[in-house]
């Protein structure tokens, strides 16, 4: 390779380097120019956006300012109108006051004129009265001189003569006034009673001594009776209610004079039929469950009754006793319904006489409360009711109303008299009571009480409409030999003390159970 070639190569390299540098520099300048242009564009765009945002914010501020100005102007207009209305009202009141003031001024002037006239007339009357008195004195002196009697003697003689003439007329007038007053009192009393009776519309139906349980089919009767009658005997023994299973299709009749026991038996039997499992153990469980259900129903009935008559703050135990009245009858009349009716009647009578209606309702509701437990406690229902009212802190007026509603003691308040009157109204209403049913129930109660009076007797149930008394005894106190003796003693006492048609079967039941648990 010669020198020329080397120079050419070197020249080419130099030219290449120079050319590359020039190209690179041009490219760099071009990129810088583009970057500057881009930066300027970005800045310009940012300025434009900032201007737009500024314009938007200004517009929004103007709009908000306009809205605020309009709201402020509206509030100002409303306040101005309100002030104008108030000013108008004040002006009207001021005008009214001015008119009233003018009227009062005129009335004062008229009154002053009348007073002056009255004073003038009074002076004239006084002058005339003085002259009349002078004339009277002169005439009296002249009469005394002529008659020879003093003024006092003449007055006494005249009064005696007038008294003799009027004595008979006065006696006749007094007699007429007494008759008129008596007729007025009778009429007022009748109007009060009629008003109270007309304001109360109450329906009562005579209570029955039987309940009917419907069955899904007649095959259920055999299951209720059980093998050799053990199921029906268990149910009758636990409830004291007679189960009558006859040809009546798909029905069993429960007979018993105690409505609570009958309801327990009915509830238990309905639950047994629904459950389908009928055997002595299950019967015991269902009877216990039915007792709890009936106990709840009793308490609910008491609470409903106290709520209906607005008798608040009554002791819970007393409320429950009131609920028991729902299962008690008096001559066929439901005692709870009767008590509520008496409460309403007493309240209406109290309202007519201006007495305390709430207290009258409370006394009316509780007047027969002793009947709820009179078959469990010794004494009349009045005595028991008084003791219950005292025990649970009732008002003295309520206690006296209970004590006096049958005339056992004198009533000490108008409320007591009104409760007695309301009780008589409710009981005397046609169809409210039946004498025969009450006598029948009393005979059955007496039969049970007589049987339970012997030692060792746990329970006694009158069944078969009173033709049988079933006596449950304690096996620890009464053995088999004593059972026969007890049956004979009860039979003899029934024959001596009770009156009854036909004959009564005395059955003494002694049951011993041995229970062990396998573990």
Swiss-Prot record:
GO-annotated cellular components = plasma membrane
- Residues forming the KH domain are 209-269
SUPFAM superfamilies (UniProt xref): Eukaryotic type KH-domain (KH-domain type I), HD-domain/PDEase-like
Which BP terms in the Gene Ontology apply to this protein? Answer: mRNA catabolic process
* The protein's enzyme class: hydrolase
Q: Where in the cell is it found?
A: Cell membrane
Transmembrane region(s): 3-23
| Known EC number | 3.1.-.-
Where mainly located?
Answer: membrane
Membrane topology term: Single-pass membrane protein
Sorted UniProt keywords: Cell membrane, Endonuclease, Hydrolase, Membrane, Nuclease, RNA-binding, Transmembrane, Transmembrane helix, Virulence
Domain annotation HD: ranges:
335-428
GO terms assigned for molecular function? RNA binding; RNA endonuclease activity
Q: Pfam families from the entry?
A: HD, KH_1, RNase_Y_N
Query: What protein family is recorded?
Result: Belongs to the RNase Y family.
What functional role does this protein have?
Endoribonuclease that initiates mRNA decay.
Q: What is this protein called?
A: Ribonuclease Y
């Amino acid at each position: 390779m010669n020198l020329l070639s080397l120079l050419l190569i070197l020249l080419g390299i130099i030219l290449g380097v120079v050319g590359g540098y020039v190209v690179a520099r041009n490219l760099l300048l071009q990129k810088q120019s583009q970057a500057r242009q881009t930066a300027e564009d970005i800045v310009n765009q940012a300025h434009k956006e900032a201007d737009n945002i500024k314009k938007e914010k200004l517009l929004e501020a103007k709009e908000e300012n306009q809205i605020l100005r309009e709201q402020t102007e509206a509030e100002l207009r409303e306040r101005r109108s309100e002030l104008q209305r108030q000013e108008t009202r004040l002006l009207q009141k001021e005008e009214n006051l001015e008119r009233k003031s003018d009227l009062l001024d005129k009335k004062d002037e008229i009154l002053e004129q009348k007073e002056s006239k009255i004073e003038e007339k009074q002076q004239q009357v006084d002058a005339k009265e003085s002259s009349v008195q002078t004339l009277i004195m002169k005439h009296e002196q002249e009469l005394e001189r002529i008659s020879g009697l003093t003024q006092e003697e003449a007055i006494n003689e005249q009064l005696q003569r007038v008294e003799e003439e009027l004595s008979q007329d006065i006696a006749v007038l007094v007699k007429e006034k007494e008759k008129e007053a008596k007729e007025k009192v009778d009429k007022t009393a009748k109007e009060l009673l009629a008003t109270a009776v007309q304001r109360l519309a109450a329906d009562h139906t005579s209570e029955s001594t039987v309940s009917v349980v419907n069955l899904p089919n007649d095959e259920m009767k055999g299951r209720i009776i059980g093998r050799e009658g053990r199921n029906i005997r268990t149910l009758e023994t636990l409830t004291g209610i007679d189960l009558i299973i006859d040809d009546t299709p798909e029905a069993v009749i429960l007979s018993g004079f105690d409505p609570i026991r009958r309801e327990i038996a009915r509830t238990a039997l309905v639950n047994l039929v629904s459950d389908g499992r009928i055997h002595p153990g299950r019967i015991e469980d269902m009877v216990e469950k039915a007792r709890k259900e009936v106990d709840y129903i009793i308490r609910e009935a008491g609470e409903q009754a106290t709520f209906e008559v607005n008798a608040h703050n009554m002791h819970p135990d007393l409320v429950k006793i009131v609920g028991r009245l729902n299962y008690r009858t008096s001559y066929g009349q439901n005692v709870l319904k009767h008590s509520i009716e008496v409460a309403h009647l007493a309240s209406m009578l109290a309202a007519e006489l201006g007495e305390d209606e709430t207290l009258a309702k409370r006394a009316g509701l509780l007047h027969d409360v002793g009947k709820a437990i009179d078959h469990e406690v010794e004494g009349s229902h009045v005595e028991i009711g008084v003791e219950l009212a005292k025990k649970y802190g009732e008002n003295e007026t309520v206690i006296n109303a209970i004590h006096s509603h049958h005339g056992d003691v004198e009533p000490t308040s108008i409320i007591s008299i009104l409760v007695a009157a309301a009780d008589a109204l409710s009981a005397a209403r046609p169809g409210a009571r039946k004498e025969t049913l009450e006598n029948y129930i009393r005979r059955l109660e007496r039969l049970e009480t007589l049987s339970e009076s012997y030692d060792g007797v746990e329970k006694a149930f009158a069944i078969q409409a009173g033709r049988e008394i079933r006596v449950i005894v304690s096996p620890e106190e009464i053995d088999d030999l004593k059972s026969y003796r007890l049956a004979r003693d009860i039979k003899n006492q029934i024959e001596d003390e009770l009156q009854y048609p036909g004959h009564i079967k005395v059955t003494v039941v002694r049951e011993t159970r041995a229970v062990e648990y396998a573990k």
